[in-house]
A protein has these predicted regions:
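Bacterial N-terminal signal peptides
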Residues: 1-9
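Sec/Tat signal peptide C-region and signal peptidase I cleavage site
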Residues: 11-16
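Early extracytoplasmic/domain-onset interaction patches
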Residues: 17-50
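Short structured motifs
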Residues: 22-27, 105-111, 176-180, 190
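Short, solvent-exposed beta-strand/turn "edge" segments of beta-rich domains on protein surfaces
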Residues: 28-37, 111-117, 183
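Structured domain cores in non-transmembrane regions
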Residues: 47-128
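Surface-exposed, acidic/Ser/Thr-rich flexible loop segments
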Residues: 109-163
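Glycine-rich, aromatic-bearing surface loops/beta-hairpins
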Residues: 139-143, 147-196
């Protein structure tokens, strides 16, 4: 079911509207003054969490899904059954350097899944296809599902960050990305903008 839910994320727009909600925070990782990767943290809504846990624990409903730490086996199942499919959608991650689209890698590093209270959380590092210098022009990073089946947005109270070698003098902020409207122009996604 969880693999199906995320596979449907790029289904026809006519059937879209959020079925899953995800809060995110992104940290841009610098090396030698350029952004080389993005560390992303995702928190799923409680309904999706129950569905995901029910699938891997073979139970039905919240009353039978114990909110407890995930086992290594469960983390492996989540990665195989739900997370790995997101590579087909660039992990819902969109990057532009000076207005030009930048590719991300198909494989992530440092994948983890965990429980954060009653919510399933993912964390992972997503390399950029090529390092980007935000000093050459603003770097914009958005995490959203183009079909709007999954509503992805910045986590409240958690600001985007920059870190690493050469990140000094750079700052990240959340902006309304009016250049990439969703759901027939009705939804303005949020994006992280880095300027140095």
């Amino acid at each position: 079911m969880i693999g199906l839910a995320l596979a449907l994320a790029s289904g026809p727009k006519a059937e879209a509207h959020p079925h899953v909600w995800v809060d995110t925070v992104v940290t841009a990782i610098f090396s030698q003054g350029k952004v080389t990767s993005l560390r992303e943290e995702w928190w799923f809504d409680e309904d999706f969490t129950v569905t995901a846990l029910s699938d891997i624990r073979k139970t039905k409903g919240m009353s039978r899904v114990a909110i407890r730490p995930l086992t290594e086996g469960e983390i492996g199942q989540l990665r195989a059954q739900a997370f790995s499919n997101l590579a087909n959608y660039a992990y819902f991650t969109h990057v532009w350097a000076a207005g030009k689209p930048i590719a991300v890698a198909r494989e992530v590093t440092a994948f983890q899944a965990r429980m954060d209270g009653a919510r399933l959380a993912y964390s992972f590092t997503l390399p950029l296809a090529a390092p980007q210098d935000p000093r050459a022009g603003p770097l914009r990073i958005g995490v959203w599902d183009d079909s709007y089946y999954v509503d992805v947005g910045p986590a409240k109270g958690l600001a985007p960050q920059v870190e690493g070698d050469g990140s000094q003098g750079c700052a990240a902020r959340i902006i309304d990305d009016k250049d990439h409207l969703l759901y027939f122009g009705a939804v303005t996604p949020k994006a992280m903008e880095i300027k140095c």
